[in-house]
Amino acid sequence: MEKRTEMHKALAQIVDRFKLDWRVLRGVMLTTGAVISGSAALAVLQPGEFVLQDLDIYVTSKNFATVVVFLKEQGYNVQIPTTDVHTSTYPKPNVILTHKNQTGDKIDLIAMTERHVVHAITQFHSTCVMNYIAYYGIVCLYPQWTMHKTGLVRTEWADQQAINKYRGRGFAMVYTPVELPKYERTHACGMHWGCVKARRELHDDLTLFVPFEDEEFNIHTEERMRVGWVLQNEHKCSLEHSG
């Protein structure tokens, strides 16, 4: 309970830091399906570990304009990009609009082409940032690694600057599954919980879900769509067998 309270407090501090009205923001998230992801979600899971420079909000292309209007009402204006600074930061293809307020606080609004945010998040550079905050609570897809400050880099072509950023925040960023905590070399490939070739589901027992105080909503009642993914389908396990 104490850890959960710390997470709620961290979220409140982030919302206050970016001068947003949480009640209104949560309502917008409810109606549009928008979520907060990136470093902000990790900062809620790891309270007090680092200071945020910006906030990432993800939403489907269909509801993009609604969130733009909300940010405008909160004092944020769209910035005209001078360079393509987002090229290696976000999954492709996505549309990104950077917003700033008068005090220079920065919010990136990312329009997803995917049907569900999980399909975008599982394309992130590493598992430690595969988390999000929805109107119903906080979701961490790989808590067995993330909560132990370890991230598996999904691809060798990941942006090194992004990887170094999380190393600087105290995360062990590894490139092979054998470096992960409690990795079992003799596991059944594609079936074991720790195998990167295993199919995961949003509703499976490995996903960490932290509800908000009211508990009116939860991941099981609010996420009706069956959402699954495979982290590294092309990976060759060291001791593959049919199980």
Regions found by a protein language model. Give the residues of each.
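Short hydrophobic alpha-helical "box" of cullin-RING ligase substrate receptors
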Residues: 1-5, 121
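Short, flexible/disordered secondary-structure transition segments
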Residues: 8-11, 78-82, 132-135
